[in-house]
UniProtKB/Swiss-Prot annotation:
Keyword Protein biosynthesis: no
Organism lineage string: Eukaryota, Metazoa, Chordata, Craniata, Vertebrata
Record keywords: Acetylation, Cataract, Cytoplasm, Deafness, Disease variant, Dyskeratosis congenita, Isomerase, Isopeptide bond, Nucleus, Phosphoprotein, Ribonucleoprotein, Ribosome biogenesis, RNA-binding, rRNA processing, Ubl conjugation
Active site: 125 (nucleophile)
PTM sites of type N-acetylalanine: 2
Name this polypeptide is given: H/ACA ribonucleoprotein complex subunit DKC1
Family: Belongs to the pseudouridine synthase TruB family.
Encoding gene (name): DKC1
Region span, Nucleolar localization: 2-21
Mutation effect (residue 56 to S): In DKCX; due to a 2 nucleotide inversion
Length: 514
């Protein structure tokens, strides 16, 4: 029998089911309609997490510390807040018109929306147009962080004399990158001090040699004066130049492509809501403040820890559910709830590696609390000792502040440690110690100086000692003479006193006669 040839057929690879990415319109509808929440379970979400809204985007890629927590019904998804809260915790990406100042524009929006407080990130000069982020009420807490964010501009520079082609202008623009010295222009809203501002990138878009106009794009640090940059361009080219027109195309996270709205849009949206109760246009015009924080590293907290943070508690590791990769010490991060609401801005005190290895400790310190207090219920003071303390206050064994009284059991006094009092004592002790330490330091410094001066002094020569002895002997003689005269008062003393009186009288008479 001939050997039968065995033919091995190649295995069919099963194709992985690829999730079809939905069109943007459908995603927007789903985001506004459904409830989005990081649930205490490890099931895959229905909608791809890359299409989840705002700060919950790609939450499944965050490092998981624990999935166990008790969800609370309080709070809501930023996109599904009630219209009043939605506006009070929102911002507008406004296309600023030419001529009115930034402060005027912001005041008009405050009047249109009928809110108490508005603020803007990075002032634009009256003639400058473009991206102006207007923060409303609660969102004004983020103004500082947005003011210091990078900016992008498109400007037109007019040269005073002709140059050969646009290559010279593009070279000059490339030269004026990096850290530059700038003094604000003559007409400026700030003090005219020399300062350093960084230009990250710049490029020429177009140059018209007939009209001597150049269009350029600049990405720069906050507080850079483009007018001054245009003057410097003219000086560098040797022909002189000035800024003709300017538009801001990006401010921090928001650009002019991110649904920028005009003043008319805001006015129309408010009119529709007032007259037809249609809030859909207002929701398009105003964005939740969480959109400004999408570039920050995230830290997801348990619902039970949220209100404590709003009251200024330390961000401790047991309250953390998830954390992002690449967190560094002293980096600005955003602390969020499981529903994607921003609780506060914080400064990280642990890196991602330390968070993953530790089981206790302070993760970050609060920089700015964003969320309103008591949005979530209070969940502190529910431990065994705290519960016992509350019961004893009810029974009258402790006073209303939880301090021991005459009727307090001896066992409680011995066992219970009031950490708030111990902390106060430590602070008082430190305050008392501080002046003592300062006094001791001053004494030691004095001693050092004295010892140094003594060591620096040379031994005195013999003639100086002789002089000192002579002076002493003279003093002793005078003292003895004084004692003798004091012991035996004679007529001489009375004569001298009489003479003095006569002299005084004579002087007085002379003065009167003059």
């Amino acid at each position: 029998m001939a050997d039968a040839e065995v033919i091995i057929l190649p295995k069919k690879h099963k194709k992985k089911k690829e999730r079809k990415s939905l069109p943007e319109e459908d995603v927007a509808e789903i985001q506004h309609a459904e409830e989005f929440l990081i649930k205490p379970e490890s099931k895959v979400a229905k909608l791809d997490t890359s299409q989840w809204p705002l700060l919950l985007k790609n939450f499944d890629k965050l490092n998981v510390r624990t999935t166990h927590y008790t969800p609370l019904a309080c709070g809501s998804n930023p996109l599904k807040r009630e219209i009043g809260d939605y506006i009070r915790t929102g911002f507008i990406n406004l296309d600023k018109p030419s001529n009115p100042s930034s402060h005027e524009v912001v005041a008009w929006i405050r009047r249109i929306l009928r809110v108490e407080k508005t603020g803007h990130s990075g002032t634009l000069d009256p003639k400058v147009t473009g991206c102006l982020i207007v923060c409303i009420e609660r969102a004004t807490r983020l103004v500082k962080s947005q003011q210091s964010a990078g900016k992008e501009y498109v400007g037109i520079v007019r040269l005073h004399n002709a140059i050969e082609g646009g290559t010279q202008l593009s070279r000059a623009l490339e030269t004026l990158t990096g850290a530059l010295f700038q003094r604000p222009p003559l007409i400026a809203a700030v003090k005219r001090q020399l300062r350093v501002r960084t230009i990250y990138e710049s490029k020429m878009i177009e140059y018209d040699p007939e009209r001597r106009l150049g269009i350029f794009w600049v990405s720069c640090e906050a507080g850079t004066y483009i007018r001054t940059l245009c003057v410097h361009l003219g000086l560098l080219l040797g022909v002189g130049g000035q800024m003709q027109e300017l538009r801001r195309v990006r401010s921090g996270v928001m650009s002019e492509k991110d649904h920028m709205v005009t003043m008319h849009d805001v006015l129309d949206a408010q009119w529709l809501y007032d007259n037809h109760k249609d809030e859909s246009y207002l929701r398009r015009v105003v964005y939740p403040l969480e959109k400004l924080l999408t570039s920050h590293k995230r830290l997801v907290m348990k619902d039970s820890a949220v209100n404590a943070i709003c009251y200024g508690a330390k961000i401790m590791l047991p309250g953390v559910l998830r954390y992002e990769d690449g967190i560094e010490v002293n980096q600005e991060i955003v602390v969020i709830t499981t529903k994607g609401e921003a609780i506060c801005m914080a400064i990280a005190l642990m890196t991602t590696a330390v968070i993953s290895t530790c089981d206790h400790g302070i993760v970050a310190k609060i920089k700015r609390v964003i969320m309103e207090r008591d949005t979530y219920p209070r969940k502190w003071g529910l431990g065994p000792k705290a519960s016992q303390k509350k019961l004893m206050i009810k029974q009258g064994l402790l006073d209303k502040h939880g301090k021991p009284t005459d009727s307090t059991p001896a066992t409680w006094k011995q066992e219970y440690v009031d950490y708030s009092e111990s902390a106060k004592k430590e602070v008082v002790a430190e305050v008392v110690k501080a002046p003592q330490v300062v006094a001791e330091a001053a004494k030691t410094a004095k001693r050092k100086r004295e010892s140094e001066s003594e060591s620096d002094e040379t031994p005195p020569a013999a003639p100086q000692l002789i002089k000192k002895e002579k002076k002493k002997s003279k003093k002793d003689k005078k003292a003895k003479a004084g004692l003798e005269s004091g012991a035996e008062p004679g007529d001489g003393d009375s004569d001298t006193t009489k003479k003095k009186k006569k002299k005084k009288k004579a002087k007085e008479v002379e003065l009167v006669s003059e």
